[in-house]
């Protein structure tokens, strides 16, 4: 992974990219009802929103959305500008897919334990994916992935949270603060100190602005659930944030039938031609596969009587356990028809 302690030259004003942009209205907060500080067991946590409905349901006009899409295209890809490719994804070794899934699970679970916002967890996963898109990790250095996960969550908290924890608060006995700080520096330099990251959440209000007021809130929350349900298998740099948001909304809006081009147009209006519909449908299909797997897993757990708290294993599981993880296969029963991108009209 390279020498994290190597001397690097940072920009003249690097801290400007780490300024927290909180405005006090957190759309993606952990459930405040549970004040035990433990964040639940096994990553059990609920999605909730601020009481200020006008924040969640703020109207966005087409001009604003067009500006967001234009800026996204200039950035070049999902998250940090690294564009994913399905053929390259198929070439990723299975152990790396499983190791990444472990890292994402740890980030989401620890994020809940600290009661950070959901956006913080997503930003941390984005840092992880951007780093892995630029640096290779040897199979015999899985410990470095765990250290990387801590560094990504720590940096995301410094960007997104008002009170980010100190490194000792992560309570990882196997690593000292100096090692974590070196990994943080390696992440910062690898990502070129570009730490302000666009997320799919920025687009949820825009894409639901034309829906009925009484259904928008439920659709946004359902879309957020879809995004986090698929975060272990869909790289945040594989699709642009707008693509992920739109695919999640299409799933949240209609559970029974696959959307068509007319429904896509009804969501984004005249701006649909600025989107890569092929990528939207590809992302939709992957999310639906994960939905099928989640439903199958939930059914199997319910029928077996196993507590949901035990899903995902112990927090102290070794990274090597990811190598032996069994990849679930999508159940062939009751699967929705996969989409194919239609011709532009």
From Swiss-Prot:
Chain spans, region Disordered: 1-44, 313-345
Family: Belongs to the cyclin family. Cyclin D subfamily.
Keyword Cell division: yes
Leader sequence segment: none
Protein name: Cyclin-D5-3
Alphabetically ordered keywords of this record: Cell cycle, Cell division, Cyclin
Pfam families, per the entry: Cyclin_N
GO cellular component, as recorded: cyclin-dependent protein kinase holoenzyme complex; cytoplasm; nucleus
Residue ranges with Basic residues bias: 334-345
Phylogenetic placement of the source organism: Eukaryota, Viridiplantae, Streptophyta, Embryophyta, Tracheophyta
Gene behind this protein: CYCD5-3
InterPro entries: Cyclin, Cyclin-like_dom, Cyclin-like_sf, Cyclin_N
GO biological process, one term: cell division
Species assigned in the record: Oryza sativa subsp. japonica
A GO term, aspect molecular function: cyclin-dependent protein serine/threonine kinase regulator activity
Biased composition (Low complexity): 1-17
